[in-house]
Amino acid sequence: MFYRLRFAVFFFLVLAAQPIISQGAQSRGAARQTNKAQVARMTRRPDTTHPTPSYIYTINNDLANNGVVALKRSADGLIAEVLGSPFSTGGKGLSGGDIDEQGAIRVHGEFVLAVNPGSNSVAVLRKQSGGKLMAVPGSPFPSGGSHPLSLTVHKNLVYVANQAAEWGNPASAPNLVGFHMDSDGRLTPIPGSRIEFPRGAGPAQVEFSPTGENVVVTSGFQGENASRIHSFRVMSDGRLHEAAGSPLAPQGASGTVGFSWSPMGDRVYVSNFRGSAITVFSVDRQSGGIRQVGGAYGDNEQAACWTAISADGRTLYVANFVSNSISVFDVGTGGKLTPLGTTKRRAGTSPDTKDIEVSKDGKHLYAVGSGKTEVAVFQIGADRMLTELSAGHSPVKISTGQNTTGLAVD
C-alpha cells in the first residue's frame, strides 16, 4: 500500500511538471523564433518594388496668391502635378519677366522653403502625405528686406538674399539676412546678421557649401554694375564673416547669376550672362578665402544664367536664357571645364529657359520654362548629354501663375 501511494504521488508530480517543462520549451522556442525574425528584419533587403515617390517643386509667382507647385516624379522621370497644387505661401509673387535668381525654393528634410518676392517674406511649408504641403504656424516670415529672391539652408541656419529691386529699378539697399530655424520650421532673425550690398547690385544667389562651413553669394548683375563674388565664413553664432579675397570680380566675363558648388565644397562654378560663360573659383574650406581659377569658359550660346551639377561633380549643366538651351561641360582636374555639347529646348518661346536641377538618381534633368509656365524633362544619357522626353511628356504645363520661378528636387 505504501509503495502504491508513493508511486501515485510521484506520477502526479510528473504530470504536474509537464506543462511547466512544455511552457519553458515553448518560451525558448518562441525566443529563438523572435531572434530569427529580428535578424531577418535587420538583414532584409529594401523593398524596391514600391520606391518612395519623389517630388519636384517650383513657385508659380502668382501676383495675388503666390504658391508652391508640387509635381510627383516617377522612376522614368515623368512628372505630374499633385492634387491640390499649388499650395499657398501666404504671400505674393513679383511682376516682371526677367527675374534673375537661383535658389528661390529649397527642400530641407520635411520642409519646403520658398520666397515671396512681392510681399517681402519667406514661406515655410511642411510635407504632407501624397506630396501635399501645409504652411507651418507663423508662416510666412518677414525676409528682413525687399524682394527676396534666393535663400539657402543648412541644419538650423537659413540665409535670405533680398535683391531690393526689380530689373533696372533700384529701390533700396539690397541685403543678406540670417535666421535660425527651429524644429517646427519657424524662422527667427539672427541679431547682427544683416549684410548690405551696394544699390543696384543686389544678390542673385546665396548658398551654403555642402558642409555648411562657408557661404557664397553672387551679385552685381543689375544695370552695368561690375559683377562680384562674395565668400563668407560661417561663425559659431550663425553670423557671416567675409573671407580673404572677397568680394572678387570675375575676369573674362560679367553678369553673375547662378552657381553650383563642387561636392567637396572647394570650388564654385558661376554663370555669367554677359559673354555667356562660366567662371571657376577656388574656395578654401577652412578660411573661406576665394580666388579665380583660369579664365572664362564660353558655351557659344546666349545668356548663361543658371547652373546644376551632377552628384559626382563630373558634369556641369548650364541653362542659357536667350538661346533656350542647356550646355553640358565635363569637369576635369582642378575644375577645368570642357564643353560636351548643347541641347535646345523644344519649341520654347525665347527667352525662356531658367532654373535647372538634376534628379537625385542622376537620370533626368528638369528645366523651368518661366514665361510659358512649364517644366521640361530631359533624360541624361551614358555620354551625359541630354535628350528631351517626347511631346506629351515634356514640357509639362503648370496650372496657374506667371513667370514660374525656382526649382527644387526632393
At which residue positions do the language-model features occur?
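Beta-rich, blade/repeat-based domains predominating
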Residues: 46-51, 89-108, 142-157, 196-214, ...
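Residue position within the beta-strands of beta-propeller blades
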Residues: 58, 114, 160, 217-218, ...
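Short loop/turn segments immediately following beta-strands, especially the blade-tip
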Residues: 71-79, 125-133, 178-187, 231-241, ...
